[in-house]
Regions:
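Subset-of-secretome marker
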Residues: 20-217
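Bacterial N-terminal signal peptides that target proteins for export
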Residues: 1-8
Length: 217
């Protein structure tokens, strides 16, 4: 008679595991090439970049906005200047950037100026962006799949080629290892998280290929 409760407990545990939906992501050599191809086809995307801690070479605390594959971007950011966090609005069209601080109007500056230390147009650049980075990975370990912001996602621990990564994010140090989540349906990147030395850089994407119109102010 004592076997019945034990059997019931075992069955309940199996049922709970099945209901959790957690399963290992597919092999990386299946997912990453598909993801690289999917990201190469993206016309525009909304992104958010958050920096927790000090990241040498990346003089921003946060950034968000919309970026296009044509080299345009628009949004807001928090840059670090003279030890202070300064919120700015920005527009990038081609080789020109326009930045506006808390007061005053937009100032035209070249892309890469200290007033805009991170160029978000790199995200969809065919040579330096997400797609190129995914093609240049050195190793990737599948982990349990999970939901990210309501999206069913495959999760991987990925080591990227350090040279390719240096083109992607100008952070000094060994930042080329990341946890990356891919949309199970579209293979597009949902989120990437980089950690090193107690600091974290989180990059998230949504609203892929919405209608956008970015013009110089």
């Amino acid at each position: 008679m004592r076997l019945m409760p034990l059997a019931a407990t075992a069955l309940a545990a199996l049922a709970l595991a099945a209901c959790s939906g957690a399963e290992e992501s597919p092999p990386a050599d299946e997912t990453l090439p598909a993801a690289a191809a999917a990201m190469a086809e993206v016309a525009n995307v909304r992104f958010s970049l958050a920096v927790d801690g000090e990241v040498e070479g990346l003089e921003i605390a946060a950034a968000d906005g919309v970026v296009t594959s044509g080299g345009e971007a628009e949004g807001t950011g928090v840059i670090t200047a003279m030890g202070m966090d300064v919120e700015v609005s920005y527009v990038i069209v081609g080789e020109d950037a326009y930045v506006k601080g808390f007061t005053g109007g937009y100032q035209q500056i070249p892309v890469g100026d200290d007033m805009l230390p991170y160029d978000p147009t790199v995200l969809l650049s065919p040579d330096r962006g997400v797609a190129a980075l995914l093609e240049a990975y050195e190793s990737a370990e599948p982990q349990e799949s999970e939901k990210v912001d309501g999206v069913d996602a495959y999760r991987y621990e990925i080591v990227f080629d350090p040279v390719a990564f240096a083109e992607f994010i100008p952070a000094q140090g060994e930042w080329n290892t990341a946890t990356v989540w891919f949309d199970q349906e579209t293979s597009r990147v949902v989120k990437a998280e980089f950690e090193q030395g107690g600091a974290t850089v989180t990059l998230a994407f949504d609203d892929y290929d919405d209608s956008v119109d970015i013009e110089a102010p």
